[in-house]
Structure formats: structure tokens, C-alpha cells
Amino acid sequence: MSNMQQKTDVILIGAGIMSATLGSLLKELAPEWEIKVFEKLASAGEESSNEWNNAGTGHSALCELNYTSEKSDGSIDISKAVKVNEQFQLSRQFWAYLVKSKLIRNPQDFIMPLPHMSLVQGEKNVQFLKNRFEALSKNPLFQGMEFSDSPETLKKWLPLIMEGRTSNEPMAATKIDSGTDVNFGALTRMLFDYLKTKNVELNYKHSVENIKRTKNGLWEVKVHDMNSGKIEHHTAKFVFIGGGGGSLPLLQKTGIPESKHIGGFPVSGLFMVCKNQKVVEQHHAKVYGKAKVGAPPMSVPHLDTRYIDNKKALLFGPFAGFSPKFLKTGSNLDLIGSVKPNNVLTMLAAGVKEMGLTKYLIQQVMLSHEKRMEELREFIPNAKSEDWDIVVAGQRVQVIKDTDAGGKGTLQFGTEVVSAADGSIAALLGASPGASTAVHVMLEVLEKCFPSRMVEWEGKIKEMIPSYGISLTENPRLFQDLHTSTGRTLGLNEKETVHN
């Protein structure tokens, strides 16, 4: 059963944080535009954006060591860390604007202040962390960071981690109190509640089956209404594909030249969750370690305080798993179905190149509960098996493409916008830092897809996001003012004490 074509201005595919952010920006910039959202699941924020399906870190490179690499002369390259931090500041500013404008309420339901810490062991790693601390401390975005290699200080900062430690190996940590824990699931649901009040049409249990170009230049989206079983056809001038791991297969259906020679490799994440509330209360930070030599960036171990359903939780991970599904709720045929004549060589080249990743995934899949406990005990020496359960988090599809620097079949560890030359359709691919940089990434979509509107929109964008187009690193006074004002609006300025 098929019905007539239904026209609209904008179609957003996927009801996650990315579509929620883009929809919110567009409703502020072009309130008269009609927007329709199609989501396969029964509600918003249930896949990658769901609070149990990601680490909930407000990624601002305060503690993630993979954003600061060591050069051959021992100096530290902080350029990536600065970039990630600048991008997170845009998210903070937009969220603060939404709260201040009363478009969303109760910021404590989606963002909480939480110290971000890095922790290392061994003389060489201690020196690396000290060098990193010194390099970052010169940058205004990282003011307030502390370094210590004193066991007494570390016991105060990290009581749970330091208790029962018998090794005399040198240890060091950095600590910064301006970190955050973000519940992206709650934020996504809030944004869609706001969009509903702006007459955005939210269609849940609607699966997008195909996307094709019409003769008059519009995009026709074929949608299966899973409630009624009917097939619908919707057309729009602009389509955004924000379906997490499901974006790649939909992008391939568009047939745009930019969709060729791109592949995807799914990796699932697993976390250990503490079920002993007494243990949970002894830790109050996100603590990131250093990835083991040869392990991919996604494997950086971290012990995180989380706030989920207004309750404090403690998670450790990630451990990697493998499933051929591109979404947690996807199909076992997703991976094989994404291999096309135009990307098969790219995929094969990646297979040869990434033997290290393949080996790592095989080792991870084979881990028993006790083996995972051994890894946890590197963080919490006294951890008891009976206190910890394993939860399967979300699927992440790492992008594989041909690059000038890496050659054919290069694995990308990041978030990437792919758009048609005329800006009529865009898709978001990739993984970390993901949700934290949603505002930056969606501004990139606007710049790529609506270049002729940017001059007209710039004033409103700067009202919502004052540092848009400005380097905060080069404007420390502006950074300080914005950090203070957004912190006040989002309830982040109250320095929380470490639970001893």
C-alpha cells in the first residue's frame, strides 16, 4: 500500500543527538521551515545517544590521553586536544542558550560537574603525563589542571584506586574540576520535546527504506510505517541522515558520488557496571588511563562516575566486542550488505592493514569475566567479581576510506560529515568524540549545505553560540567570561568535593 508524495522542507533521519541538535538549530534560524523526523525505534535517543550506549563523557580533552601525542623529541602535540576542547565549548554555549531561553529546563538532568583525571603508571608514562600537563597548562582552555606524583595526594584524589595498592611502581595523575558527565539520552529527549512544541513532526516506528533523487531535484524518502504496515513517500529539499551506524547504508542508497569508496567496520563496546553502592560512593571522577601499546584509540580504559536516572553509577571499560550489526538493533547482514563494487577494494585494503585491530578484537571477544576483572584491578586493586556486571553498550561503525595520507582503506577514528556537492543531503558517519561535538558538527552541516544562508544566519548563530568563528585559545578573556556564564546557567560552577 503506497500513498501520495508528501512534501516538506527538511527530513531528519534518526532521532538521536545529531538530528535533535540540527533540528533545534534550524528551528531557531528558520522557524518557518517544515521539518519531519523519522525514527525506526519507538522513542528518541534509544540507540547510540542512549545513556547506557555511550560513555557520557563531555569530551573536552581534559583527561583523554589519545588527544595529545608525543613527538619524537619528547615534546607534546596538543593541537588535537585544543580542537576537541574548542568544539565542546560550542556545545556548552548552545545548551546554555537553550536553558536560558527556557527552551529546555533542568540542566542537572543532562549535565553534571565532575572532575576529569588522567592516571598513569611507570616512569616513562609519568614523564609523559608531566610533559602533557606542562604543555596544556600554557593554554587558557586547560587552566585549573593540577598534576601530582605524590602517593599521599593520589590517595586523596583517588581513594578507591589507591586502596590496597602494593606495587612501588611510580604513578601520577592530573585533575581538573571543570569536567562534566553528560547524559546524552536525556538531552536528546529534551530537545525532541522542545521540537514537538515547534510543530516538528516526529514519526517513531518509521523505518527509512530508500532515498532517491527526483527529476525536479528534490529527495524522495521511502518510509515503512511499522505501526500500520503502510509504505509512505516523503519529499524534501534537504535531508540529513543522522542514523548512527545506520547512516552508511542509507548514504549508499543516495548514489551521490561522495558516498563512493567509503566502508564501515562495526565495533561494539562493553562496560562493567558496579552493583555495590558502597563502592560507587567511594569514587567521584572520570579517570582515563593510557591505551596499551599497539591497541587502538577506542581502547583507552576509564573508570567513570556517571549520573543515570538521577542516580550515581560507576562504570569501567570499554571492552570491545564484535557483531556484524551496524546498530544495536540492526541486522547480522549489515556489514556484508554494506560491501559494494565501489568500496570492496577499500574494505579489503583495510582488512590487510588493520591486522592489529583484528587481533585486538579477537582477544577482547575471548575475554572471560575473570580476565576482565584482572583489567579492572589495574584500576581498583580490591575489586570483587561479585560486585560487577557486564553491560553491552552501543555499536560504533568506524569509517574506512581512501586518504592521501593513509592510502587505500584507511581506518578513521573520528566523526565525519559527508554531503552532496549541492548541499541537498548530508550524512554523519563515525564515532568518538561524537555527541560531545554535536553542535560543532551540525554547524559544519549548515556551512556545507546552506552556504548562501550563512551571512543571514550569522547574527543569530552568534547570539546562541558567542564563540562561533572565534578561537577561544586566542581570546582567553572571552573564554573565561563564557566558561563562567555557561557554567552558571548549566549549574556547573559549584565545585563538588571528592567523596572520601
Swiss-Prot record:
Its cofactor is FAD. Pathway: Carbohydrate metabolism; tricarboxylic acid cycle; oxaloacetate from (S)-malate (quinone route): step 1/1. One of its GO terms (molecular function) is 2-hydroxyglutarate dehydrogenase activity. Keywords: FAD, Flavoprotein, Oxidoreductase, Tricarboxylic acid cycle. The keyword Lipid biosynthesis does not apply. InterPro entries: FAD/NAD-bd_sf, MQO. Its EC number is 1.1.5.4. GO terms for biological process: tricarboxylic acid cycle. Transmembrane segments: none annotated. It comes from the Bacteria. It catalyses: (S)-malate + a quinone = a quinol + oxaloacetate. Belongs to the MQO family. This is Probable malate:quinone oxidoreductase. It comes from Bacillus cereus (strain AH187).
